[in-house]
Amino acid sequence: MRPRTAKHLGILAIVVAATSAGCSSSSSSKAEPSTSTSTPPTTGPHRTKAGLAKIKHVVIIMQENRSFDSYFGTYPGADGIPSKNGRFTVCLPRPSGPCQAPFHDKYDANSGAGHAHSDAIKDINGGRMNGFVRQAASSRRGCRAVQDPACAHGLQSDVMGYHDAREIPNYWTYAKDFVLNDRMFEPVTAWSLPAHLYMVSAWSAKCASRLASSCRNDITGPYSLKEQQRFVDRAIATGTAPVHDAWTSITYLLHKQHVSWGYYVETGKEPDCADDAATCTAPPQDYKTPGIWNPLPLFTDVQEDGQLKNVQPVESFRAAAKAGKLPAVSWITPAQVHSEHPPASVHAGQAWVTNLVNDVMRGPEWSSTAIFVSWDDWGGFYDHVAPPAVDGNGYGLRVPGLVISPYAKRGYIDHQTLSHDAYLKFIEDVFLDGQRLDPATDGRPDPRPLVRESAPQLGDLANDFDFNQSPRAPEKLSPNPRPGPASSIAG
C-alpha cells in the first residue's frame, strides 16, 4: 500500500495555472458463433477526403480497466472467448487446485487484478495468454481499504468473469447498431498513466528538461510520487512551471493548424492509485489539477501555446454539445464513480457514457460527429488474444472499442488490428491532412521510438464509416436500461 494525498497535485495546479496564464489456454480457436456481421474493409468513397470532411467533430470517451473478453467475449461474431459447441474450451491454471474456466459474472462491482507493466507481462506469459489467474492470486493481499479491488465481493479472483447484455445492454446495443472493434489494443503494456499519455501524444517518457530532445522512453511510471513532489518543490522555489512532459502532443499540431480541441475532466475522485499501487486514499480530481487522468496541463507545448484554457470540466462539454459549439476534438475522462475501474459500478459507468452520447445526439452537431468509446487498459481481466508487437512498448492487451456516428456502418465488427493510436491517426487524417506526430516533420523533435500512427500493423478507423449513406438519426438510449438476454455460450 502506498497512501497518497492530493496535496502535491493541488499545489502543482496552482503553479501551472499561475505560470501559464499567458490449466491451458487455446488462443488460436475462435468464439462461437463463427458467422461475422462485418464486411471486409474497402477502398471506396468512404475513404476519400470528401468523406472524411463530413466529420467536423471527434469525441473520445475513455473509460477504465476492462478487457475485450470481459465485456464482449460472448458477443456474436466477434473474436471472443474460445469455445466449441456452445461451451468454453479455455481453462487457466491457478497457483493450486483445478484450473479456472470463464464464467458469467453477475456482479456490478468487480475486482480485476494488477495492471502494471509487470502484470501485463505475467498475464501475456510469452503469448500463451494464461497468466491471468496466477497473477491475480499473487497481487491480492486481502481487503484493506475501500479502493482495494479485493473488497468488491470476497477474495475469489473474478478475472475470468465476463459480462454480457444482462449487465451492459447499452454497450451491446451500440455494438449491434453501430461498430464494434474486436482487435483494439491498449497502446502500451502498462497501466493508466502511460495509456493516457499515449492517448494524447502516442508516447510515454521522462524528460530531463523542457527540451523535447531530453525525453527518454519510459512506460513503467513514468513519474513516481517522489518525483512528482520534486517537480512541485522546484516549481515553488523557482516560480516557474515544472519540467514534466516535454515531448510533442497532438494538441501542438492542432493548435498550429487552428483546429479547436477540449479535454474534459469529471470532478470527483481519481479512478486509481498513483504508481499503480493496490490501495490508496483516492485524491480529488478536477480540471484544474494535473494528474494521471488530466495529463495535458503538464505538457510544455500546451503551456507554451497558451492552451490550458482548453482543459475544462465535463459540464462544459455537455453545454457545448447542447449549444452546437463542440470543438473539433474532445477527450472525456471520468471520475472514480463513473470510471468502471474496479470496484466502481459497471452500471454507473455505462449510464454516464450513455448520457454523454445522448448529449451529442440531442445537439445540432450529431450529424457531423464521430464518437469513439474505449477503455484505457485491461484491468487484469482475461483476454485470449496475444497483443501484436509494434515496438518495445506495445501493443498492450486487448480492450473494447465502439464507434458511434451517423456515418458509422450498422452492425459492423471491425477485425482490423487497432490501438488507441488509431484515434490520433483518424484525427490527423480528418483535420491535419494526414500530418503525423513525426519528429522529422513536426518541428519539435523528440526521440520517440516510432511514429505510431504510421505503424504498418495499425488499421484505419475510416473503414468503420460509410460516407455514402445519409446521416443516421440519433439513437438515444435510456441510461437505466432493462437487462438484455443472456449470451448463447454457457459459462
What are these regions (language model features)?
Residues 23-491:
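N-terminal pro-sequences and low-complexity stem/linker regions of secreted or lumenal proteins
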Residues 2-27:
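Secretory targeting and sorting signals
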